[in-house]
Amino acid sequence: MPEALSAAQPASFQAKSRRLTRGEALVGLMLNLPAGIAYFLMLLLPSLATILLAFTDYELGALEWGWIGIANFEEMLEDRGFAIALRNTVIYVGLVTPLSILLGLGAALLIEAGMRGRALFRAVFFLPVVSLTVAMAAAWQYLLHPTIGPLNAFLRLLGVTSPPFWLSSSDWVLLSLGAIGVWENVGYNMVLFLAGLSAIPRELYQAAEVDGTKTWLDRFRLVTWPMLGPTTLFVLTITMIRSIRVFDTVAVLTQGGPNKASEVLLHTMYKEGFTFLRLGYSAAITLLFLLMVLGLVWLQTKALDKRVHYG
């Protein structure tokens, strides 16, 4: 039928339609050209440059450099500092991800349940997300100060004679940074879970009550949690990526110390590139970091995606 209508149209009309189609395509191309140029200059070009630098011995300011193949990656395997940074990053992600997801989900459930002051609590929980990380890190530096910090002052009131040195003790520094990371991510996760909760049809809860579901725990187990599957997968992926990218708090509060106890991948990458001026080695760490993030997203999507989407 469409072919018959097309054949019945005058040739002049078809030619005009083709001209309009070409004109619209040209206009669309011109409108997208600035964004395409910006995308190439700000994302693709730096990414390509990083990949190329990862296989060189280039140092910042040097006039000469050479191709060294995978020597930078071989050095990484033997670099004790890199191994420590990788281990600390894994521990940090393992601390921040589950705690911030559980607390974010708990906050979202309380707010969705209609608790009093829900707007205030929503703003308070979301405050760390919209605050400057460096400014918040400075505030945490005061709160965790071993002598004048409010936290240790409170512990002394409780009878703790020797409160921990939160940011200058190898035993406590990574836990302290992890607690700050949880605080930073809870509000963001809460908003995502609130969006997921609002999308659950109310009829499902009514049907569950008809089937004999009485307690909130049963409603959560049988309705809420299964229907939050896609949201939970997204929150898990985003939280792990945000955690593995930790840099600001480390740079402001500890600079990787004491004795590399809080050294993480991005801080190592920064030091190698802009302190030791070894841009080639820094680019190799950057490339490995990018591959880790992409691999993490791929594994989570492949392993969990089929289990949480319902058709």
Language model segments and positions:
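Short, Lys/Arg-rich, polar N-terminal cytosolic tail immediately upstream
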Residues: M1-G23
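A structural signal for multi-pass alpha-helical bundles of membrane permease subunits
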Residues: V27-G311
